[in-house]
Amino acid sequence: MKLWKKILVAVGGLLGVAALGGGGLVWMRVSAYDSSMSQVYAFALPKIERSTDPLVLARGKHLVESLGGCAANDCHGADLSGGKTISMGPVATITAPNITLGGLGAAYSDGELARLIQHGVKKDGRSLTFMPVHEINWLPDNDVQAIVSHIRTLSDSAKANGPMTVGLIGKMLDQSDALILDVARRIDHNHREVAPPPEPTKKYGRFIGKGCTGCHGATLSGGPIPGAPADMPIPSNITPDATGLAGWTFADFEKLLDQGVRKNGKKLDPFMPLESLVTMNEIERKALWDYLTSVPAKEFGNR
């Protein structure tokens, strides 16, 4: 799911959060957020070092552009020199930073970059803000190495990092679990589940599918997102139900990924992050398809 759009989803739930209580509740949640974000996590640095192997570098480039979603315009940008600033008023101002060798890529060691991907913590051991590490920290060490190695090949960009601030409302939404801003708090650091080697199976597809739940819900049946703005597009059902993918073929699914066109000929809303999906390779597409068609069929809206 595109990251800034998750903010739009969560902002819609603000009235519900406010209705839970008065100033005391606000203070408690803001204080809890600040305390959590100031925590220093003492994770050892993974023993991962960059590689110059062309195959490793190619794998890293692919992951950055596809499953990682890093190169999206609303993330780090096509050249990874930093994304556009998304201003959400009193909720937050978010800018994905420059991660080339002219930015954070030079400030972090290989191990620190690997730890960031696996545990969602910065160089100083404190939590990242907003980056969806919980959707990609299943990548095995060799894939993490590939990403780190690719970052080391990026051109030096002197582009300055944009603002990254979280307002009172954003802190409340995070503590209400309506929006993930405090990244490290959401990760099970002691039992990190790692994907098997890439293969066109539902077993591997389950990990890829983690990136779908933000919009389509835990059951993948779609439907209106609770508290979302009225003008936000409604996520589709992507389970094998009659209201979802029943009757679809793998060819239909590939057309959706490549052209953004549904089986019925209708185009997807731009809300769907097609710039990342279109770069998925055949193994990833088949794995995700096999997974989506294996999950329990749920009627549309049973999120």
Regions found by a protein language model. Name each.
Residues T52, L57, L67, G125, ...:
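Interaction-mediating elements
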Residues K2-S38:
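N-terminal type II signal-anchor transmembrane helix
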Residues S81-G83, K123-L128, T153-G162, A195-P200, ...:
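Inter-heme linker and motif-flanking segments adjacent to c-type heme-binding CXXCH motifs
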Residues G13-G16, V26, V30, L139-K202, ...:
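Extended surface/linker regions that mediate inter-domain or inter-protein docking
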Residues G21, V26, S109-K122, E135-N161, ...:
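C-terminal capping alpha-helices of c-type cytochrome domains
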Residues G60, L67-D79, I147, G205, ...:
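The canonical Cys-X-X-Cys-His
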Residues S38-S66, D177-G209:
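Electrostatic cytochrome c docking/interface patches
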Residues F43-A44, G77-E112, S127-P140, V166, ...:
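Gly/Gly-Pro-rich "capping" loops immediately C-terminal to redox-active cysteine motifs
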